[in-house]
Amino acid sequence: MNKIRKGDEVIVLTGKDKGKRGTVQAVQGDKVVVEGVNVAKKHARPNPMLGTTGGVVDKLMPLHISNVALVDANGKPSRVGIKVEDGKRVRVLKTTGAVLAA
């Protein structure tokens, strides 16, 4: 069970974007793509068959999952634990003990 999932609100713990918050757009193995964080400029070649123009495009690049943490209700970074409730595994915030939606 992944502790961080698509749609979770996270904060960046390390790197050039430290302290920034965003929503997880995708989880790719041990990496996550966070909205508005770790944006790189990519040069795109024009493709007339697809109708795309060339130029410099902003692209979201993945971060390692260990460099982000979920945000609790107080706005602080929190680690995530796994708990069994009614025979199902649920994610629980370590700081507040709140159960996260599945």
Curated annotation (Swiss-Prot):
GO terms for cellular component: ribonucleoprotein complex; ribosome. One of its GO terms (molecular function) is structural constituent of ribosome. Keywords: Ribonucleoprotein, Ribosomal protein, RNA-binding, rRNA-binding. One of its GO terms (biological process) is translation. HAMAP family: Ribosomal_uL24_B. One of two assembly initiator proteins, it binds directly to the 5'-end of the 23S rRNA, where it nucleates assembly of the 50S subunit. This is Large ribosomal subunit protein uL24. It comes from Cupriavidus metallidurans (strain ATCC 43123 / DSM 2839 / NBRC 102507 / CH34) (Ralstonia metallidurans).
